[in-house]
Swiss-Prot record:
Species classification: Eukaryota, Fungi, Dikarya, Basidiomycota, Agaricomycotina
Subunit structure comment from the entry: Component of the 2-(3-amino-3-carboxypropyl)histidine synthase complex composed of DPH1, DPH2, DPH3 and a NADH-dependent reductase, predominantly CBR1.
Species: Cryptococcus neoformans var. neoformans serotype D (strain JEC21 / ATCC MYA-565) (Filobasidiella neoformans)
GO molecular function: 2-(3-amino-3-carboxypropyl)histidine synthase activity; 4 iron, 4 sulfur cluster binding; metal ion binding
GO CC terms: 2-(3-amino-3-carboxypropyl)histidine synthase complex; cytoplasm
Locations listed in the record: Cytoplasm
Biological pathway: Protein modification; peptidyl-diphthamide biosynthesis
Function noted in UniProt: Required for the first step of diphthamide biosynthesis, a post-translational modification of histidine which occurs in elongation factor 2. DPH1 and DPH2 transfer a 3-amino-3-carboxypropyl (ACP) group from S-adenosyl-L-methionine (SAM) to a histidine residue, the reaction is assisted by a reduction system comprising DPH3 and a NADH-dependent reductase, predominantly CBR1. Facilitates the reduction of the catalytic iron-sulfur cluster found in the DPH1 subunit.
One of the protein's GO biological processes: protein histidyl modification to diphthamide
Entry note: cofactor: Binds 1 [4Fe-4S] cluster per subunit. The cluster facilitates the reduction of the catalytic iron-sulfur cluster in the DPH1 subunit.
Listed cofactors: [4Fe-4S] cluster
UniProt-annotated stretches for the region Disordered: 493-515
Gene that this polypeptide is encoded by: DPH2
Protein name in UniProt: 2-(3-amino-3-carboxypropyl)histidine synthase subunit 2
InterPro entries listed in its UniProt record: DHP2, DPH1/DPH2, DPH1/DPH2_1, DPH1/DPH2_3
Similarity comment: family membership: Belongs to the DPH1/DPH2 family. DPH2 subfamily.
Length: 515
């Protein structure tokens, strides 16, 4: 009955009349990019390479993740892939409306299938993931490579001649990676300047099988390195693409380097390093807000990012050692309304990808910082603000945090600091006493992180270095006491208990006693 009056769920993917329509389908400028105009669907979306990887890996459940702008081409791509892998018993699925963001692999949706292989279409942030094998298919945008070289050389002439910069590092957006060979050949024609290229390395079959490098890390998909024999401070950065999160991340992680961006749409060059100090000033302001916070919320931006799980565990342990209260949240895509529901949280820490890990919007009620900034804030007033070390790489932050933890354990004096001392807040301009939260039902010890007095008898009392009693607070009760509205008036013990009476019965349009 339902088939006669409704369209089947798989109508758009399996209807036989689509064969003739999709047989000669071509990719247009509105689909995968203007560089793919005139190409077939198979060529523009790398169907042959995708099928080859599926067959070599013997994958059976394949997720095809499309951003919103590429959904019109999803049916054509799905049918082209499915017809070539059906004989192996494999099944492909179209994934849309990503849980977190289009730039990251949607691992959560893949786990719902569950999928053992994911094809990611469109723009990508290139943050490594170790949850499942991923194959990236980038957009294809047009680029006049010769014009780009001439414009960038003319704009950065003063930095190369006057400032003593000896090298150039060329970085491009993923939508121009299909022209990588042309970019290398054209940019390397000037032999008087040393040039290195931040090439994109797509995951190989070895990395798809879950293999890691000799250090136990998931290999990076792109690394920005100076030319051989030079330091990074000796180089000028050239970026090919439009302004966005990817460019801003490059700008902040290399704050000491001149950065010039070439916009292919306008064929113009702009110096971005002049605005770097303003961006870093915002991050420094958020850092000082974190110094005054006692309750933190750890936001999981994407569950499939490499090093995200051990980093979350490390951040929770660091906050616990500092007597800070932490909550772990997974809210999908961020917006001010979602985070406003957690009013007791004073500062959020976003564990995210290379492009979505920084939130500078003023619409959020509380500050949102990065894991690197949190580790710096936990050092207290003794921290050293070093913009050249600012990073969104989760693996780097995890390594530094683990090394700092080892030093703290080796130096016993740091674990016996005076946590009840006053500190000055640069944000509010007032003196404050740091809150110390208790964990569990007993007294928390710094030596072995165990709880004492589980049976209700507390034979040991926590004291600070001056041998005075230390006050341990509860995050929930402290926040409730500070609120003006604490709920309806309870009136405990103020009213006599009333006798239970029979209430109304019936429906709203006519109760029993009204008839």
């Amino acid at each position: 009955m339902s088939d006669a009056f409704s369209t089947p769920a798989d109508h758009a993917l399996s209807h036989p009349e689509l064969e003739a329509i999709l047989e000669n389908a071509q990719a247009g400028p509105s689909s995968i990019g203007d560089g793919a105009e005139g190409m077939s669907i198979e060529e523009a979306f790398e169907v042959d390479e995708t099928v080859r990887r599926v067959l070599e890996g013997d994958y059976k459940t394949i997720g095809l993740q499309f951003p919103d702008e590429l959904l019109p081409s999803s049916v054509s791509v799905y049918r082209a892939i499915q017809t070539r892998i059906a004989h192996t018993g494999a099944q492909a699925y179209v994934l849309a409306d990503s849980t977190y963001g289009n730039c990251c692999p949607d691992v959560l949706s893949c786990l719902h299938l569950p999928a053992d292989f994911l094809v990611h279409y469109g723009h990508a942030c290139l943050t490594p993931t170790d949850a499942l094998p991923v194959h990236y298919v980038f957009p294809r945008q047009k680029l006049d490579v010769k014009q780009a070289v001439e414009s960038l050389l003319a704009a950065s002439k003063n930095e190369l001649d006057g400032d003593g910069r000896k090298g150039i590092v060329v970085v491009w957006d993923v939508s121009y990676d299909w022209l990588a060979n042309d970019i290398r050949d054209t940019f390397s024609q000037d032999s008087t300047i040393q040039i290195s290229f931040a090439s994109i390395q797509k995951p190989t079959l070895a990395s798809q099988k879950g293999l890691k490098d000799v250090k136990g890390k998931t290999p990076a998909l792109r690394s920005v390195e100076p030319p051989q024999g030079l330091e990074m401070n000796d180089c000028v950065l050239w970026y090919i693409g439009e302004e966005g999160r990817s460019c801003m991340n490059l700008q902040m992680t290399h704050a000491n380097n001149p950065l010039f961006i070439y916009s292919p749409s306008s064929q113009s060059v702009s110096p971005l390093h002049r605005t770097t100090s303003r961006l870093l000033s915002r991050r420094l302001f958020a850092l000082h807000q974190a110094l005054s916070a006692d309750v933190f919320g750890l936001i999981v931006s994407n569950i499939g990012l490499a090093s995200s799980k051990p980093l979350l565990a490390q951040l929770r342990e660091d906050l616990k050692r500092a007597k800070k209260k932490s909550y772990t949240l997974s809210v999908g895509r961020l917006n001010p309304a979602k985070l406003a529901n957690f009013a007791e949280i004073e500062c959020f820490v976003l564990v995210g990808c290379a492009e979505g890990g920084v939130v500078d919007s003023k619409d959020f009620l509380r500050p949102i910082i990065t894991p690197w900034e949190l580790e710096l804030a936990l050092q207290g007033p003794d921290h050293v603000w070093a913009p050249e070390n600012w990073t969104l790489d989760l693996g780097t932050v995890l390594k530094d945090a683990q090394e700092r933890e080892i030093k703290i354990k080796q130096d016993s004096s740091t674990a016996d600091s005076d946590d009840d001392s006053l500190e000055f807040s640069l944000i509010t301009g007032t003196m404050r006493t740091k809150k110390r939260f208790a964990f569990g039902n007993g007294t928390h010890t710094l030596e072995n992180n165990k709880l004492l007095g589980d049976g209700g008898v507390q034979d040991l009392t926590l004291r600070n270095q001056n041998f005075s009693l230390s006050k341990l607070e509860s995050a929930g009760s402290t926040f409730l006491a500070s609120r003006e509205f604490q709920g309806l008036e309870p009136r405990y013990g103020m009213d006599e208990p009333s006798v239970l009476e029979q209430g109304r019965s019936g429906v709203a349009r006519g109760y029993t006693e009204e008839k």
